[in-house]
């Protein structure tokens, strides 16, 4: 099988089979899988994503589209730095070696990529464009630097965006993330929050789960900002944001974030307060609050109620208010908010009901809308009316106003690492922050770097960061932070439209290809890459790089490939190939010691539950692997790797070769009967396989093609064979299977005597009239109970059906000589005779 696969891969390369033109009279179709990080080797878990995309690309080509199906490398990132430290070599060497190996692997799987458009994000010819783009953002005040609390990963020694913190830990290292106050570069994604939110409803071809995740991440809240004066220091106020300002008369405390500026100014930091602040610093994002027990510590400060100066409220540092949401301060209304209620019970704060409810708010918060009570001038109003009224009062008093807040925060793009795109800025003691002139781009990373594992090597480089200021020509230093790698992946799909363009994009080419018609990748990118790419597209539209404002028309999120995990007696992970099963138990192949089988999980390097691609290719071939990862479950669902599954796919491919030999040896028999049912099945399969592929029901399409192959095999085994229909059916089967298993189908197609390549052919056409059956079977009922069945010709009339069914012996038995009162027909399904 490997020889056949290598043969066709060579032919496709020589014939430039999958290179496409930007100038074609055909309609365009752009299918794209999320570009991989060049980690070293592709395992079978990766293959599923690429196989799905390849089926769609090949199918749409057969449907008459000019299909763009490119591939490239998301090549910056920390793993390369870790490898550099471990091997004492430059990350570039490790990265380019991995790219070479992985490209070879992808080609060996027969994927129909247009390699002439390949991009590599660590190539200066690529990242020079995003450096220029960053400077354009800076000129528009969409890029800025400020000091802020950031998520610091102490293992990777870098800052993480909120989206890169999962359950309080770094998404790559798994280390517990802490807060640090650092100067960072940000992009103003919040300027586009409203459009990003509103446009979600137009992404009709995206999974509802992803759209919902983005809506929640952007998190629009409508409410009010208003001020509380601090008791005994009334010139100073605390500004709060609330989505339920109408409950102001139920306030019993002010909650502030652990890093609220008022703490530095006015709060005496007791050991209790300092310990609590340290504890809070480990909470890095609002999603973690749901799992955190509500706690607080009193600051010693009180504020005055805005509508009743006799009421004072304690100011409490809480662990459920974050500085990066709203103003970093809230007023707590325990009777009508679950978090506030939990804290009030714990700290013995008052719980005052201000919305009518048939429940005891001392025990549980009532969080629904209703009629206001115990609320002075708001009494008797609905929650909505009271909200408008109280905001009006804030505005009259000059202490507040209506406002909108978003959970989404500006994107922190600074990373304290070497292997990333340098941020093209210079810091001058005289001139301040100075952009690198366009003519001096790209700012390229140095080759002579020392990786000792501590911090960012660019900070310690003896010469790279030292430059003269472009404004005053005095000594200055370069920015040593590099871009978050999501910067590169936020626009790469535009570069594919013309990867040789002298500017960031070839607008004409982008106008032809964009938006991407079908984007394929993991749902884990819903609120990182997919949101950033949407943001970039909007800004690049305004900079006249592209005409679209949304990058991806359709999105498909594939399921993961799973495999069992194994551990030895020392709790070390083992690779599947190191384990052998004896009976119902597992043992280490070399030591013969007992092995514990763990959970079935996503294939990952850390748990070693990977299946090596090259080993599987040697054993079964690329086509069998492709077929298996697509056939055992719907592509949006997880798939468990199984030896029996891949062996079954290998047998099916061998069966195709056997069928070819059997059919090739057949002689035409003019006396054989036409197998109308087989002919109907051929046309039925063409129609429904096309529909299945369009709807990404690839496993169902494979099942239909297996059914057709079984029907053809059954016909071959007969004494009298309808050779013409068998040959036609087998030709169709080979064509239908081509997007799934392209090597063996091209080989068989050639052996069938065909000159044209399958990749150049149109998808088979079906004849609708052939789908009609000559006969159909109807259920015959008497008084609603099944008494018989009867096969009718399609040409039969309703009167004939009634006459035949009434005269059936089994029906006559129940009629007992009576005439039917009524006969009800459900066409081609049921005859119900009423007596």
Swiss-Prot record:
Subcellular location: Cytoplasm
Gene Ontology biological process terms, A to Z: leucyl-tRNA aminoacylation
Pfam family, one: tRNA-synt_1g
The EC number(s) this enzyme carries: 6.1.1.4
One function term, GO molecular function aspect: ATP binding
Keyword Ligase: yes
Broad class of where this protein is predominantly found: cytoplasm
Binding site for ATP: 605
InterPro entries, A to Z: aa-tRNA-synth_I_CS, aa-tRNA-synth_Ia, Leu-tRNA-ligase, Leu_tRNA-synth_edit, M/V/L/I-tRNA-synth_anticd-bd, Methionyl/Leucyl_tRNA_Synth, Rossmann-like_a/b/a_fold, tRNAsynth_Ia_anticodon-bd
The keyword Mitochondrion is assigned to this record: no
Catalytic activity: tRNA(Leu) + L-leucine + ATP = L-leucyl-tRNA(Leu) + AMP + diphosphate
Short motif 'HIGH' region, span: 36-46
Gene Ontology, cellular component aspect: cytoplasm
Positions occupied by motif 'KMSKS' region: 602-606
Family: Belongs to the class-I aminoacyl-tRNA synthetase family.
Protein name according to UniProt: Leucine--tRNA ligase
């Amino acid at each position: 099988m490997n020889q056949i696969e290598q043969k066709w891969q060579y032919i496709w390369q020589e014939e430039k089979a999958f290179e496409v033109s930007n100038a074609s009279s055909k309609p365009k179709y752009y299918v794209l899988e999320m570009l991989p990080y060049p980690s070293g080797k592709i395992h079978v878990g990766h293959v599923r994503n690429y196989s799905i995309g390849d089926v769609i690309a090949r199918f749409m080509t057969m449907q008459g589209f000019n299909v763009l199906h490119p591939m490239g490398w998301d090549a910056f990132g920390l793993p390369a730095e870790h490898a550099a430290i471990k091997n004492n070599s430059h990350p570039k060497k490790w990265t380019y070696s991995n790219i070479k190996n992985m490209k070879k692997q992808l080609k060996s799987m027969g994927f129909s990529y247009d390699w002439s458009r390949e991009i590599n994000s660590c190539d200066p010819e690529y990242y020079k464009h995003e450096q220029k783009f960053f400077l354009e953002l800076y000129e528009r005040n969409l890029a800025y630097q400020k000091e802020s609390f950031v998520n610091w990963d102490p293992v990777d020694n870098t800052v993480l965006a909120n989206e890169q913190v999962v359950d309080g830990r770094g998404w790559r290292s798994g280390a517990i993330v802490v807060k640090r106050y650092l100067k960072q570069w940000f992009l103003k994604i919040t300027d586009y929050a409203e459009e990003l939110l509103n446009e979600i409803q137009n992404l009709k071809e995206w999974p509802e789960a992803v759209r919902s995740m983005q809506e929640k991440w952007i998190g629009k809240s409508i409410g009010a900002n208003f001020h509380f004066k601090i008791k005994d220091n009334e010139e100073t106020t605390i500004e709060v944001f609330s989505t339920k300002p109408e409950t102001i008369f139920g306030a019993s405390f002010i909650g502030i974030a652990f890093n609220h500026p008022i703490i530095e100014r006015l709060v005496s930091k007791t050991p209790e307060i300092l310990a609590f602040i340290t504890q809070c610093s480990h909470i890095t994002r609002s999603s973690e609050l749901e799992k955190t027990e509500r706690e607080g510590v009193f600051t010693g400060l009180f504020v005055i109620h805005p509508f009743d100066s006799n009421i004072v409220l304690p100011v409490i540092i809480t662990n459920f208010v974050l500085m990066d949401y709203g103003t970093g301060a809230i007023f707590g209304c325990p009777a009508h908010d679950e978090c506030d209620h939990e804290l009030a019970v714990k700290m013995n704060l008052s719980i005052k009901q201000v919305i009518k409810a048939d429940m005891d708010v001392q025990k549980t918060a009532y969080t629904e809308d209703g009629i206001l009570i115990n609320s002075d001038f708001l009494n008797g109003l609905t929650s909505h009316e009271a909200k408008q009224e109280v905001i009006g009062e804030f505005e009259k008093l000059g202490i507040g106003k209506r406002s909108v807040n978003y959970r989404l925060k500006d994107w922190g793009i600074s990373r304290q690492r070497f292997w990333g795109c340098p941020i093209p800025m210079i810091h001058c003691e005289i001139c301040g922050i100075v952009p690198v002139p366009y003519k001096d781009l790209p700012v390229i990373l140095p080759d002579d770097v020392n990786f000792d594992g501590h911090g960012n090597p660019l900070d310690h480089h003896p010469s790279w960061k030292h430059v003269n200021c472009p404004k005053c020509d005095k000594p200055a230093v370069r920015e040593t932070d590099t871009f978050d790698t999501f910067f590169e992946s936020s626009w790469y799909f535009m570069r594919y439209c013309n990867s040789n363009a002298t500017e960031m994009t070839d607008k004409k080419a982008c106008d032809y290809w964009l938006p991407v018609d079908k984007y394929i990748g993991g749902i884990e990118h819903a609120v990182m890459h997919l949101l950033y790419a949407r943001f970039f597209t909007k800004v690049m539209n305004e900079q006249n790089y592209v005409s679209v404002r949304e990058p991806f028309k359709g999105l498909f999120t594939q399921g993961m490939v799973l495999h069992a995990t194994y551990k030895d007696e020392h709790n070390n992970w083992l690779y599947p190939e190191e384990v052998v099963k004896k009976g119902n138990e597992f043992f280490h192949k070399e030591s013969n010691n007992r092995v514990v089988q763990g959970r079935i999980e996503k294939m990952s390097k850390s748990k070693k539950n990977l299946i090596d691609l090259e080993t599987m290719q040697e054993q079964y071939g690329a086509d069998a692997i492709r077929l298996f990862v697509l056939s055992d479950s719907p592509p949006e669902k997880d798939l468990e790797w199984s030896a029996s599954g891949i062996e079954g796919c290998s047998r099916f491919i061998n069966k195709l070769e056997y069928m070819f030999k059997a059919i090739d040896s057949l002689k035409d028999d003019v006396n054989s009967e036409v197998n109308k049912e087989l002919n109907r099945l051929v046309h039925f399969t063409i129609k429904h396989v096309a529909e299945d592929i369009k709807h990404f029901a690839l496993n169902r399409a494979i099942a239909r093609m297996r059914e057709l192959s079984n029907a053809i095999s059954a016909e071959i085994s007969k004494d009298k064979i309808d050779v013409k229909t068998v040959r036609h059916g087998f030709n169709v089967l080979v064509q239908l299977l081509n997007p799934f298993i392209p090597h063996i189908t091209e080989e068989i197609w050639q052996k069938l005597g065909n000159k044209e390549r399958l990749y150049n052919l149109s998808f088979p056409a079906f004849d609708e009239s052939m789908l009609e059956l000559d006969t159909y079977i109807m259920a015959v009922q008497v008084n609603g109970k099944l008494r018989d069945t009867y096969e009718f010709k399609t040409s039969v009339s309703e009167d004939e059906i009634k006459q035949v069914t009434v005269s059936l012996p089994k029906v006559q038995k129940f009629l007992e000589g009576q005439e039917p009162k009524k006969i009800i027909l459900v066409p081609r399904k049921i005859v119900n005779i009423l007596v």
